[in-house]
Amino acid sequence: ALWRIVSQQCLPNQQAHDNPAPCTQVDVPAGFVVFKDRNGPLQYLLMPSAKITGIESPAVLDATTPNFFAQAWRARHVMAERYGKPIDDGDISLAINSEYGRTQNQLHIHISCLLPAVKQRLAQIGPDFIDQWQPLPGGLLGHDYLGRRVTPAELEQQGAFRLLASGLPRAERRMGSFGLAMTALPDGDFL
């Protein structure tokens, strides 16, 4: 359904009428669209303007593929525009489901707000994270996670997908097994 919306509505409307509807934003040169998710008042999806199934696609590791996580971070302003006032970066999360945890076969990154309990927990443990993948102490909401600190330069230059693939043993061959999430830390880095 998502790919049909992108390919049959958003892209044609942008190209023919300079109107991204039903998407919020279409950036053909940069290779992405932003679409209002039907769930939640401030939840959006950033999707490629090309057909890419998900995190398991080899395309996400190709250096010529747009850096979708960096683009999603830059697109976070759509939430504040809809809300009518600024939203603190520490309240925003980006997330992509694993191949097995999603219902759509078009790569999409969720742009939404963190649950307050998650924000509080990450604030407690965030300062302890380094630039290597490590387990989140005690997990989060009953699940085990790995985390690492990412600088803005790393996000822009390498992107979240390549950082995952190069940072964990055998991850490159098992990308579909992973979900990824990202939020800002108070010092400007990401977790």
Regions found by a protein language model. Give the residues of each.
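HIT superfamily nucleotide-processing domains
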Residues: 1-191
